[in-house]
Amino acid sequence: MLAGHSAGGHLVCRMLCEGMLPKHVSDRLKRVVPISPLADLQPLIFTDLNSDLNLSLESAISESPVCHKPLAVNTRVWVGEHERPAFLHQAEILSEKWQCGLNIQPDAHHFDIIDQLLNPKSDMCKYLFQKV
């Protein structure tokens, strides 16, 4: 099982892209939850943040999970109902491109959505820890 939030959501998505992990490692993945992930880095090229990131179009595409085929692992994207529109869009486009589930968590935003991981009875934990 893998879960990651925001940039960590990007990292767990990249691990799910074909060719990123050795087969003996990827075969052990049973469930992945990107939480408010960055899935398409291309829009960052046109922001002030790119002066630090130095993304080219080529590198943004190369590092964007939505531009790659995912491994066949049970995946569900989680995002807060009160996220900024850009994060909602990132979650929606990842779910659409990867044809995986999308949970929009009621009354949650970017910083408190991970509180779901503190409650073993939350929908997120139930999903993560259900028997495969």
Enumerate the predicted regions with their spans.
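Hydrophobic/aromatic beta-strand patches that form the interior of the parallel beta-sheet core
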Residues: 1, 33, 76-78, 103
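Primarily recognizes the serine-hydrolase "nucleophile elbow" in alpha/beta-hydrolase
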Residues: 1-48
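A structural signal for the main folded, soluble domain(s) of proteins
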Residues: 5-8, 16-17, 29, 63-72, ...
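Glycine-rich, phosphate-binding/catalytic loops in enzymes
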Residues: 18-20, 49-52, 93-97
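Mobile cap/lid helix-loop segments that gate and shape the active-site cleft of serine hydrolases
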Residues: 37-67
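Short beta-strand/loop motif that positions the catalytic acidic residue
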Residues: 71, 77-80
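Acidic catalytic loop of the alpha/beta-hydrolase fold
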Residues: 82-86
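C-terminal catalytic histidine-bearing segment of alpha/beta-hydrolase fold enzymes
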Residues: 88, 92-95, 99-132
